[in-house]
A protein has these predicted regions:
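Juxtamembrane regions of bacterial inner-membrane/periplasmic proteins
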Residues: 1-214
Length: 214
């Protein structure tokens, strides 16, 4: 199957037809192909402030720089939660790594079957074999749903703060990182208190993990 997404400077189809091409031959599409109220402003990795990367890694995948696509500690905890009836979606942290989240975004597969989860793990491993961590982060931060029709941090920075992503403050970076777990629940406009609570959690985790000081 194919999935439409955003690259560093173009819109692309990422092809998932076969295992050898699992993470994607990229086929350029005409500019403006995405429409219908969807906002996107692709940015390159070099434009992303370190604080933005740190905010997303801190709250979404703290072992991102160490694992190879799957965080087995979180996966094991998720299996225990699932078997005991405590569904992951009700917790502050899911089992999926940033790499796995990117796979979901590119494949369009987001059901919770065991087969789908195993498939996702295999694809995440493929992605890590094909791309650097920086390339994975760039793709991830360009395709994530950040509420209000914004896809990617470039569009969200302009929409919420009226500035390019490179000019975001630490608090603004944390605000965007707070959204992606559940865009409707953490929308800064419609759910400001929820977003603030999770933004503060992101800032606390950034401090705890040594990215910022109090």
């Amino acid at each position: 199957w194919e999935s439409t997404t955003v690259g560093a400077s173009h819109l692309y189809y990422y092809r998932f037809d076969d295992r050898t091409n699992r993470v994607g031959e990229r086929i350029p599409l005409p500019d403006g192909e995405l429409n219908g109220g969807v906002l996107c402003k692709p940015v390159s990795y070099s434009e992303l402030p370190a604080e933005l990367i740190d905010a997303f890694v801190s709250i979404e995948d703290k072992r991102f720089w160490q694992h190879h696509g799957v965080d087995w500690y979180r996966t094991a905890a998720a299996v225990v939660n699932y078997c005991t009836g405590n569904r992951i979606s009700g917790s502050k942290f899911g089992a999926s790594t940033i790499t796995q989240q990117l796979v979901k975004n590119l494949s369009g597969k987001n059901d919770y079957s065991v087969h789908r989860k195993i498939q996702e793990i295999c694809w995440a491993n493929d992605l890590e074999n094909r791309c650097t961590k920086e390339e994975i982060l760039e793709r991830y931060l360009n395709v994530i749903n950040l509420a209000q029709g914004c896809y990617g941090v470039g569009a969200a920075a302009e929409y919420y703060f009226g500035k390019p992503v490179s000019a975001l403050t630490v608090a603004e970076c944390a605000t965007l990182a707070a959204i992606t777990n559940n865009p409707s629940q953490y929308d800064p406009y419609t759910q400001p208190e929820n977003n603030k609570e999770r933004r503060d959690l992101a800032l606390d985790l950034m401090c705890e993990q040594g990215y910022i000081s109090e």
